[in-house]
């Protein structure tokens, strides 16, 4: 009996691990253009701010596609659906690696965005389903850890590959790693019938939950602020701070490493007081942005800001997703799809705002604008916390 229990725990953990790897590769490809922005712009003889709109397009495809695509796939068995998504993901990366102009690259990114929109709509609820008993919150933490490792290893390695070879090779390697993960998924995941996915009828039901709607708006606001700055952090560090490319790569590594700390803090502190934890995470996201230009030439201070910022954004993302799942246990996939859509509205809006700031004010101002948007989000958090204190 003991061996059976141990075997169950082992396979359950391996399945959670596969989802963590999947989160790693999806987050790596979503944000790796941030690390390659200058190289892509140079190869197509374009400005970084213009190429940065590729991040906006990707995010808006995800935001518009998350809910309708999730509803269209609501009855499909989840393992089969995941393998289809990885096939689309891999083929799109092959096209990215072969892209002969910016528009072909943009088209390939749209294919990845379609896969992304469904993947993040169903993954949080699935990882909780396959997790060992009494380890549901930790499983969600491991999923977030995979996302954080994308920042620690994925982005810096993507940048290093891009520097040694070229940015096309980075996308090719991502496609290769995704193939290995898909094979693991095929081997390890059990049959996963769709469960509690929700339907189109769930949408108006969820919209009648004011705290849930307030959290979606909070996500859009704070993530818009974050990506106003983060989308252009690589050219900021190189052009404004005037640090070397190697230091820039190291700072991206530190940002991702901080995400591991954020995942750990979530696992330890979120359940004790979720409201205070979310507020604390938001402060860690906002303050480094507001002070980024002020201390732009002090290398150790910028490292510290990047580290605290990384802790904050990882803690915040996983905390808000957990809160959404808690408020919509009857329609987890629909709620997650709307969350993913809201998050990506924030990403797309932030990248667009950052581009506008660069063209109208200059690259040095992105932190001030991003931080100001974050402050508005903090005031909104305070409002919904007071209004729905008992929820």
Curated annotation (Swiss-Prot):
This is Probable sugar efflux transporter. PROSITE patterns: MFS (PS50850). Belongs to the major facilitator superfamily. SotB (TC 2.A.1.2) family. It is found in: Cell inner membrane. The lineage of its organism: Bacteria, Pseudomonadati, Campylobacterota, Epsilonproteobacteria, Campylobacterales. The chain crosses the membrane at residues 16-36, 51-71, 82-102, 110-130, 138-158, 170-190, 210-230, 247-267, 277-297, 300-320, 338-358, 361-381. NCBIfam families: PRK03545.1. One of its GO terms (molecular function) is transmembrane transporter activity. Keywords: Cell inner membrane, Cell membrane, Membrane, Sugar transport, Transmembrane, Transmembrane helix, Transport. SUPFAM superfamilies: MFS general substrate transporter. The keyword Phosphoprotein does not apply. Involved in the efflux of sugars. The physiological role may be the reduction of the intracellular concentration of toxic sugars or sugar metabolites. InterPro entries: MFS, MFS_dom, MFS_Efflux_Transporters, MFS_trans_sf, Sugar_effux_transptr_put. It is a multi-pass membrane protein. One of its GO terms (biological process) is transmembrane transport. GO terms for cellular component: plasma membrane. Disulfide bonds: none annotated. It holds the Pfam family MFS_1.
């Amino acid at each position: 009996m003991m061996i059976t229990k141990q075997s169950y725990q082992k396979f359950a953990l391996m399945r959670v691990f596969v989802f963590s790897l999947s989160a790693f590769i999806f987050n790596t490809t979503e944000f790796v253009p941030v690390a390659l922005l200058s190289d892509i712009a140079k190869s197509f003889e374009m400005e970084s701010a213009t190429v940065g709109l590729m991040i906006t397009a990707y995010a808006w495809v995800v935001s518009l596609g998350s809910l309708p695509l999730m509803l269209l796939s609501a009855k499909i068995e989840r393992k089969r659906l995941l393998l289809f998504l990885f096939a689309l993901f891999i083929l799109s990366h092959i096209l990215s690696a072969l892209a002969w102009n910016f528009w072909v690259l943009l088209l390939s990114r749209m294919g990845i965005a379609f896969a992304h929109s469904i993947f993040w709509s169903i993954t949080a609820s699935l990882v909780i389903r396959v997790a060992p008993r009494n380890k549901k919150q930790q499983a969600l933490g491991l999923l977030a850890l995979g996302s954080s490792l994308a920042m620690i290893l994925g982005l810096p390695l993507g940048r290093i590959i891009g520097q040694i070879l070229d940015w096309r090779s980075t996308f090719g390697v991502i496609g290769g790693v995704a193939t290995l993960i898909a094979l693991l998924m095929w081997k390890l995941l059990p049959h996963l019938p769709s469960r509690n996915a929700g339907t189109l009828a769930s949408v108006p039901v969820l919209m009648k939950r004011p705290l849930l709607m307030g959290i979606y708006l909070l996500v859009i606001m704070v993530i818009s602020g974050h990506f106003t700055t983060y989308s252009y952090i690589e050219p900021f560090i190189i052009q404004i701070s005037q640090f070397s490319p190697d230091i820039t790569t190291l700072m991206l590594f530190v940002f991702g490493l901080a995400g591991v700390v954020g995942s750990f803090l979530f696992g330890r502190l979120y359940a004790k007081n979720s409201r205070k934890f979310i507020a604390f995470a938001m402060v860690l996201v906002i303050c480094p942005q507001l002070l980024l230009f002020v201390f732009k030439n002090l290398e150790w201070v910028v490292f510290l800001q990047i580290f605290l910022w990384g802790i904050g954004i990882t803690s915040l993302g996983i905390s808000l997703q957990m809160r959404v799942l808690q408020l919509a246990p009857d329609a987890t996939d629909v709620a997650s799809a709307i969350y993913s859509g809201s998050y990506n509205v924030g990403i797309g809006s932030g990248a667009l705002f950052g581009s506008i700031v660069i063209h109208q004010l200059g690259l040095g101002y992105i932190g001030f604008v991003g931080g100001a948007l974050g402050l508005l989000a903090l005031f909104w958090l305070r409002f919904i916390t007071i209004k729905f204190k008992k929820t």
